[in-house]
């Protein structure tokens, strides 16, 4: 009798585990199916996100669960703000600009009525200063759209950090300001984002010479074996 009950418990555990595993697999399959429905890019089309990553980075570097988590958070935040916020935000706005023979395309997470670009980033712990590639992503969008400023919103497991990026002048020198909005801490920085710089990045990506452009090396699993690694 004791043995029979144990077997029944084991069967229930196995059945429960099977259902849970099935749901996990269905989530991953549904996510892949969603991405397969995206229209294929044109031969001369480059995405803004292409300019932010090393061409040597392994394609499977980002685990699918992490991508799914980011997608769910993005869509949840968008739905929340769209239905319950008083801010007027246009979500998922597609932007494009021609650079020589190439079309640079991007998709803004959001842009407010007054021309502030919003980029949401899902992380476990928000940084004390934005990651370099995220700053450049916003700056490229600002340049493409002629927006006045941008905000990076890091959504962590237990906290949210916002960073405002805008132009300013120190004396006669035009510079960029990165402000941590919760504390008011301000950092001045020089970022030379213009058509020439963007076109060079596009050519580097297309010719597969865009190597270790930002801070990716510290997160890359090849950082100890890659000869271009900035981590030593």
From Swiss-Prot:
UniProt cross-references to Pfam families, sorted A to Z: PDDEXK_1
Organism superkingdom: Viruses
Official protein name in the record: Uncharacterized protein 6
Lineage of producing organism: Viruses, Adnaviria, Zilligvirae, Taleaviricota, Tokiviricetes
Gene (name only): SIFV0006
